[in-house]
């Protein structure tokens, strides 16, 4: 079949790879000049099945108030007249129960574990390189209260046979030796040895090259203006300049911009842009830098080694589609990395970036068919687009090809939101 994918981020490009591998004729459209130039460009670098969890959970409303009042705030909400923001927040709050948290985390971990295995297989098949490391993630707790609350997460990890290690400070230092310099800053950690790291942008660009050699067509600098439909099917994609691009199957993988594309069709995706920031700084002392990813639980900041660089990613800012770089967010990232790895990198040479994470209220992406026969979605991965990209692309290819995916996908489509079913 001829398949048109809208979006060449890590999720759209991974979808192209698996669909082409299944024998389809694939074309990818993107407004940027190359693949992976938006949310995939400078994210935290984690491929972290074990850390896959919804933001909505028990106690989050109270924690959110605390975060909003912190000097280095992990959460920022700007006043808005956009009703979509408040509808999304209401749905998120409805998922803050213990039952919903366990259900959502379980399916997120299942997809993320499957995706990590798919990534490993893809790497073996193609030899793709992306500053990858397979040294796990260390979730670092600065307070005893944080450490005591980790047990609800480990119960889900146990249920899915995800390996983990609860560590005292000495164990944390064995995992990340550079932390010996700041031993007084933390009380323990949760290590997820099956997690990986890598540069999502490099991966996406290299995978796009592999796809192109497999016959996938990438059309960059193309602006999608809308979808044409008739009799319950998409009949074409309207592009700037008047062109109508056609195919047999259409895949919407435009991240935070997907809801606006589908809304005129009567498909309401509860996906809202949650702005994240990152710093990328050169390593000055390899022995004083992280070996893999350290997640600073207090500030919700991930500090990741990518080759000769340190990537520092974090902050959840609800500001619509605003992409301005705000200095207080930079200060939070700089504080976290400077506090834990003070001699690891040169903060004066850091590059500052921001991107929009497409978040659903329950944390789970929206993958699969819609009410239009030939329209599929692959979006809503939030902070886990890199973690879930390969598994999501493989699941999508199976669904389009009429094959049963290797994992349960019953709750991945938009149908789980009753008003959009």
Curated annotation (Swiss-Prot):
Residues annotated to bind FAD: 3-17
GO MF, any single term: D-amino-acid dehydrogenase activity
Superkingdom, taxonomy of origin: Bacteria
Entry EC number(s): 1.4.99.-
Functional pathway: Amino-acid degradation; D-alanine degradation; NH(3) and pyruvate from D-alanine: step 1/1
Cofactor annotation: FAD
HAMAP family xrefs: DadA (MF_01202)
Pfam families: DAO
The protein's role, per its UniProt record: Oxidative deamination of D-amino acids.
A cellular component annotation (GO) from this entry: cytoplasm
UniProt cross-references to NCBIfam families, sorted A to Z: PRK00711.1
Record protein name field: D-amino acid dehydrogenase
Organism: Xanthobacter autotrophicus (strain ATCC BAA-1158 / Py2)
Presence of keyword Oxidoreductase: yes
UniProt keywords, alphabetically: FAD, Flavoprotein, Oxidoreductase
PANTHER family associated with the record: D-AMINO ACID DEHYDROGENASE, SARCOSINE DEHYDROGENASE-RELATED
GO biological process, one term: D-alanine catabolic process
Enzyme class name: oxidoreductase
Homology family: Belongs to the DadA oxidoreductase family.
Reactions catalysed: a D-alpha-amino acid + A + H2O = a 2-oxocarboxylate + AH2 + NH4(+)
């Amino acid at each position: 079949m001829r398949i048109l994918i809208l979006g060449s981020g890590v999720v759209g490009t991974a979808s192209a790879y698996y669909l082409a591998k299944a024998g389809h004729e694939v074309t990818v459209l993107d407004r940027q000049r190359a693949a992976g130039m938006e949310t995939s460009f400078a994210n935290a670098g984690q491929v972290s099945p074990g850390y896959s969890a919804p933001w909505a959970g028990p106690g989050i409303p109270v924690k959110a108030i605390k975060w909003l009042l912190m000097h280095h705030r992990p959460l920022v909400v700007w006043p808005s007249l956009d009703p979509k923001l408040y509808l999304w927040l209401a749905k998120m709050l409805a998922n803050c129960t213990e039952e919903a948290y366990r259900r959502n985390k379980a399916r997120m971990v299942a997809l993320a574990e499957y995706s990590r295995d798919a990534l490993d297989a893809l790497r073996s098949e193609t030899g793709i390189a992306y500053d990858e490391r397979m040294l796990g993630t260390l979730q670092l707790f600065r307070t005893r209260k944080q450490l005591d609350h980790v047990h609800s997460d480990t119960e889900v990890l146990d249920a899915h046979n995800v390996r983990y290690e609860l560590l005292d400070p000495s164990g944390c230092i064995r995992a990340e030796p550079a932390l010996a310099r700041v031993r007084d800053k933390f009380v323990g950690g949760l290590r997820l040895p099956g997690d990986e790291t890598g540069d999502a942008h490099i991966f996406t660009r290299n995978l796009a090259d592999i796809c192109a050699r497999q016959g996938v067509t990438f059309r960059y600098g193309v602006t999608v203006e809308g979808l044409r439909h008739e009799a319950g099917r998409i009949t074409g994609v309207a592009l700037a300049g008047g062109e109508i691009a056609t195919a047999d199957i259409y895949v919407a993988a435009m991240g935070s911009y997907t809801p606006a594309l589908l809304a005129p069709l009567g498909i309401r995706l509860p996906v809202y842009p949650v702005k994240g920031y990152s710093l990328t700084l050169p390593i000055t002392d390899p022995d004083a830098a992280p070996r893999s990813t350290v997640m600073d639980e207090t500030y919700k900041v991930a500090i990741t080694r990518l080759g000769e660089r340190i990537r520092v990613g974090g902050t959840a800012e609800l500001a619509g589609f605003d992409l301005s770089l705000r200095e207080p967010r930079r200060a939070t990232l700089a504080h976290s990395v400077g506090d834990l790895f003070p001699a690891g990198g040169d903060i004066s040479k850091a590059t500052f970036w921001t991107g929009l994470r497409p978040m659903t209220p329950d944390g789970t992406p929206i993958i699969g068919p819609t009410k239009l026969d030939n329209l599929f979605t692959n979006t809503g991965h939030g902070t886990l687009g890199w973690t879930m990209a390969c598994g999501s692309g493989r699941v999508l290819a199976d669904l389009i090809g009429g094959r049963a995916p290797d994992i349960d996908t019953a709750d991945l489509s938009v149908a789980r939101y009753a008003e959009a079913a």
